[in-house]
Swiss-Prot record:
Keywords: Glycoprotein, Lectin, Signal. InterPro entries: ConA-like_dom_sf, L-lectin, Lectin_LegA_CS, Lectin_legB_Mn/Ca_BS, Legume_lectin_dom, Leguminous_Lectin. The keyword Glycoprotein applies. It comes from Medicago truncatula (Barrel medic). May be involved in arbuscular mycorrhizal (AM) symbiosis with AM fungi. This is Lectin 7. Belongs to the leguminous lectin family. The keyword Disulfide bond does not apply. The lineage of its organism: Eukaryota, Viridiplantae, Streptophyta, Embryophyta, Tracheophyta. Induction: Accumulates in roots during colonization by arbuscular mycorrhizal (AM) fungi (e.g. Glomus intraradices).
Amino acid sequence: MAINTSRTQILFITIISFLILAQNVNSAAFTVSNFDPYKTNIELEGNAFISDGSIHLTNVIPNSAGRASWGGPVRLWDADTGNLAGFTSVFSFEVAPAGPGLIGDGITFFIAPFNSHIPKNSSGGFLGLFNAETALNTYQNRIVAVEFDSFGGNSGGNPWDPAYPHVGIDVNSIASVTTAPWKTGSILTGFNAIAFVNYEPVEKNLSVVVRYPGGNFVNGTSNSVSFIIDLRTVLPEWVRIGFSGATGQLVELHKILSWTFKSSFQ
């Protein structure tokens, strides 16, 4: 009887271990409320750095670009079953002027192959994701991003952008597939924003909402945009998730203050 009990316990432990491992493989979840360069699992590229508990995606100088991404791969879909994961990414950020005058260029939340790295010459309107050779070449890229573009296609701006600051969804190109105006009065007053990026795998709906919860000028202000996309047609099974930012001739602050991410398969 003791032998059978022991075998039963071993079998039970084995099954539980397998289920825990399967859950870990098929889901991802983390929350970072204070970024520590020595403890946080964040990979920095380009000009990105961590200071005072926040990720700074760029230096406060012209033509700066940087990326910060989670240090491990995230499973976006299952190649054996074809099942898609749903996910929610919630992060607070600050885009603020570094001085008087116009500001630029913006930040993104991106999803790319895990072996992806920041391209050379990706400052300015390329937002740390593309360069002149890849920006509009949809066949060369494998990337989906949500951009928060503070400059837009103003006089002397980028020809692929609408003529106003905007929130956009990018698919393999810097030219967004859909955009909504970004009420950037909040940027000029220095308020922090909270962005909610959600992917619903059944409807294949990628949606974005950005809110400014504080301050008299922007209290309750929100912007939203969504796009139907099957992420399996664009991205590999395992991906890198993170943020990018860039300045061009104009300069602004680009800070990620906190980040919560959760993905799961149904």
